[in-house]
A protein has these predicted regions:
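Conserved catalytic or regulatory cores that recognize and/or transform ribose-phosphate-containing ligands
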Residues: 1-119
Length: 119
C-alpha cells in the first residue's frame, strides 16, 4: 500500500486562489484514497484550522505547522506534488520535496502519476 504525502502550493494574495487550491487538494486526495492508498493532504487538514488562527501572521502559522507536517512526512513513503501554477515557487513545496529526496524516497508530480489512481 502506498503512503503518500500530498503537497500543493497554498498561499496566495487572492483568497479565491487559496480556496481553489484547497478544493483541488481535497479532490486529488479523494482520488488517491479511492485507489486504496493512504494519503495525507496537509492543505486539506490545515486550511479549515487556519481560519481559527486569525491572530497569527503567515510566518507564525508556518512555524506552527512545520513540526506537525514533519510527523506526517516521517510516516509517508512518497510525496506527490499537485503541479498547479506556483508549485515551483512555493518554498513550502520545495522544502517538502527536498525532505523526501534526502530520505531517498520518490517525489512525483501529479500530472505524471495521476493515471496510476484510476479515472
Amino acid at each position: 500500500m502506498r503512503k503518500i504525502f500530498l503537497a500543493c502550493p497554498y498561499s496566495h494574495a487572492d483568497r479565491v486562489v487559496v480556496e481553489h487550491r484547497f478544493q483541488l487538494c481535497n479532490s486529488v486526495a479523494a482520488k488517491i484514497a479511492r485507489s486504496g492508498s493512504v494519503v495525507f493532504s496537509q492543505v486539506s487538514m490545515s486550511h479549515p484550522i487556519n481560519a481559527h488562527l486569525g491572530d497569527l501572521d503567515k510566518a507564525s502559522i508556518g512555524k506552527l505547522w512545520a513540526p506537525i507536517d514533519a510527523v506526517f512526512m516521517d510516516a509517508m513513503t512518497e510525496i506527490i506534488v499537485i503541479d498547479e501554477p506556483g508549485w515551483k515557487e512555493s518554498s513550502g513545496v520545495q522544502r517538502e520535496i527536498e525532505i523526501f529526496k534526502n530520505r531517498g524516497l520518490p517525489a512525483n508530480l501529479w500530472s505524471e502519476v495521476s493515471h496510476e489512481f484510476g479515472d
